[in-house]
Amino acid sequence: MLDFLGDLKRTHMCGELRASDAGANVVLMGWVNKRRDLGNLIFLDLRDRSGITQVVITADAGAEVHDRATAVRSEFVVAVIGHAKLREPNTVNKNIPTGEIEVIADELRILNDCKPLPFTPSDTVLANEEVRLKYRYIDLRRPELHRNIELRHQVAIAIRDHLNAQGFYEIETPFMTRSTPEGARDYLVPSRVYPGEFYALPQSPQLFKQILMISGFDKYFQIVRCFRDEDLRADRQPEFTQIDLEISFPRPETVFRVVEGFLKAAFSTIGVDLQTPFPQMSYDQAIRLYGIDKPDLRLPAMADVREAFAAESLETLHVDAELPLVAIVIPKVGELSRKERDEIKTLFGDRKDAKVFEDIKRLEKSLPDAVAKIRELAKPNAEDLVVVVAGAKRPEAANAVKSRQQAYGVYFAAGQLRLALGQKYAERHGAYKHGNFRLLWVTDFPMFEWDETEQRWNAAHHPFTSPHEQDMDKLESDPGAVRALAYDVVLNGTELGSGSIRIHRQDIQAKIFKALGMSPEEQQTRFGFFLEALQYGTPPHGGIALGLDRIVMILAGAESLREVIPFPKTAKAVDLMVDAPTPVSERQLKELGIAVVGKKDL
């Protein structure tokens, strides 16, 4: 028989009681975490979000209370009325904050029972992830997930408080808007009132936040849900949360200082004092030093060692003297076995654009002077692994774009190998331990990227990013050399956020659209409302968006975004708990004027 709560009021959370509460009358409510029956004594570990308190049911409580305690099982919801008592010294549990105290029950109410569990919500033995996602409400009872969701709350509050103190307005933007694809596919919402027409869920509030600057709000922010119908990847979510902001009249450094401030506040929630300002490097520097536009600073940068080799040496090694030649240093790896050297070649792969010399010690006999110079340039310690990557012989570049691509190809190959070696020898170098947070800004990204398949230029960030003033004259003559006033904030090789100074002049925005192959008619169809808005006194403005989910994942030391999102989708974009997506009724489809075409008919 289940009990009603009635007018009973909780006096304490389960994790609050301390030795100083001994003798107090208490009312606790929560879930039975564990039950131990010793006959005349029954122990219940009672749990809520704050922690666990041990409840003791003695013979003095009476037969009715004892019978109720005998009936309860794990995850039953109960209320306990009793008094706090100090534990005997030899029974103190030093592993929990309430370990000096226990509650002697005078009354026990069973507020709800619990079916046999599909799995035990424990951090020590995890059930299959699909089962846990189906029964997410049970999985969320795990202490680790509780800590992660609490951390998410604390991070969001810290960011909000900081931005509010800096004079930002939190302003909501629409979830039902028009489709303006920004790279990924939109999630479309059909209109019943206007058959055949659709709203789209926003991939970001990009245009709305720019319009807020046109409207004179000066400083905007929002912690906002965004939606992207992307191709499925292992750790992507179709809906995700951004920390979105925009500022009027900024320089890039204006945005940097704001972001550094709220990230410092966010990291303080786990007791980390971030050092600000973060270092900066250009996109070109990042590629040359790290072989990637998201540098991981925890390992040494790559070194340009081309000057270590004489021309005849390069010819002997069958590498291209005109292409980069870089050394990768991985600390504390020690002596490699032959098998490990072979594994480096396997990690590098069979590439046509670059080749690898898996350990410079193997070059010492044939090229001692070159190896000595490499050591001078790369500055390794005695136990460090040094690997050299060079450009393979290739046809002459057809133009400046091809030449840049070939050079960058070598850097990219070296950067990929550097990361692979960093992971392979992580236990030896120890740089990846949780808590080693290295942040930086990457600036001056290319404005455009060449699409070899489509034979046209695409926006590297998005088409509303402003080019550098000094590069305006290259928009038509050499688009690949145009730098954008774009910037990313990067942590340990992960992009936390991306932003830019925006285009605030209608004539420049039209030029960018033209460079992207957009006709005047297409510009009006897709962005006519925005091009018109730009003509009504638009101030210079810029901003950024950072992924809240990923920030919390990193702070929590979690392995997956699904560990920090209360109700995530699977890698196949399915919500197993509510079984979505699902078909809808023919009546609903008819109201919307939609006919579903089966896969076989596509």
Protein language model features and the residues they cover:
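Class II aminoacyl-tRNA synthetase catalytic cores and aaRS-like
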Residues: 1-602
